[in-house]
Amino acid sequence: MTMKIYTKRGDQGKTSLRHGERVAKDDIRIETNGQIDELNALLGIVVALMPADNPERERLHNLQLLLMKIMGMIADSSNVLPSEDKSFSSMIVDLEHYIDENTSKDRFCFVVPGGSLLAAQLQFARTKARTCERRMWTLRRDYTLDDEVMSLMNRLSDYLFILALCVQ
């Protein structure tokens, strides 16, 4: 028997969180996860556009995995990282190192997105990362969300900005 992708349970404007709770489709948790999902798809486009030998492909893929972890945390309300999970703090340090290594004084300016399709997609992903971060701060008013998760989202947009400049 084939499993169907549709259930019809969402036809009335409700959807389920991972633990089964039914919520409105515009619930802040659903909205936030939708924004993060869009960012993840944009990062997938960026990775697909990058040359196969670009070392940033692996970092971007690892960021995609962390975004999926964040979505899971939001969907099941386990919004605090286990103390042994160092993946977020490690990635924050990694992003900060990349940003520091690739930032020069002449790069601090407003940038018109473009130059190449890859650079433009990176700038688009950067703007989506900022949208995600804003939705996550809204979510955090009513739900717990780990400080390291919030820090990662803040660094992510900076990283994408610098990466876009580097590939331009």
Where are these regions (language model features)?
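Phosphate/pyrophosphate-binding loop motifs in nucleotide- or prenyl diphosphate-using proteins
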Residues: 1-168
